[in-house]
């Protein structure tokens, strides 16, 4: 069990190290970026208000959320689209490239988590 957690820890630390891929760097540059990205990945799309309502301000402040969305949109990790019914509201979602980075990371963790499942059965 310790080895499995060590592998997950090592992968998270290595993911945070600078890579050639700016999208991967963005995802793991801070815990707030990672939390916001996983929140958006759990939704098809969300407005700033929805995000701020569902992520407590003690976890990520509104201004930090705005900055992460702005930076992520600039590097094409997120996409921003206008609400056709209310031009003031903007929807944010993962871009295809952002989604691919997240899926690749999750698939790389598949072995670790399947080992975790197997070790709990053996116990």
Regions found by a protein language model. Give the residues of each.
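Amphipathic alpha-helical dimerization/coiled-coil segments
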Residues: 19, 103-123
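Short acidic, hydrophobic short linear motifs in intrinsically disordered regions
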Residues: 45-55
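Short alpha-helical segments that sit at the start of domains
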Residues: 8-37
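Short amphipathic alpha-helical interaction segments
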Residues: 59-74
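C-terminal regulatory/oligomerization modules of transcriptional regulators
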Residues: 1-6, 122-123
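Short helix-capping/hinge SLiMs at alpha-helix to coil transitions
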Residues: 40-44
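A short, conserved structural fragment
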Residues: 73-83
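Short, cationic-aromatic polyanion-contact patches
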Residues: 83-106
């Amino acid at each position: 069990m310790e080895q499995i957690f060590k592998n997950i820890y090592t992968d998270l630390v290595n993911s945070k190290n600078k890579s050639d891929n700016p999208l991967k760097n963005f995802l793991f540059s801070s815990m707030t970026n990672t939390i916001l990205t996983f929140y958006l990945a759990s939704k098809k799309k969300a407005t700033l208000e929805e995000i701020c309502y569902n992520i407590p301000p003690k976890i990520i402040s509104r201004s930090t959320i705005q900055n992460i969305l702005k930076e992520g949109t600039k590097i094409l990790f997120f996409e921003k689209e206008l609400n056709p019914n209310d031009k003031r509201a903007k929807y944010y979602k993962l871009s295809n490239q952002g989604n691919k980075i997240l899926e690749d990371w999750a698939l790389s963790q598949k072995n670790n988590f399947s080992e975790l499942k197997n070790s709990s059965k053996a116990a």
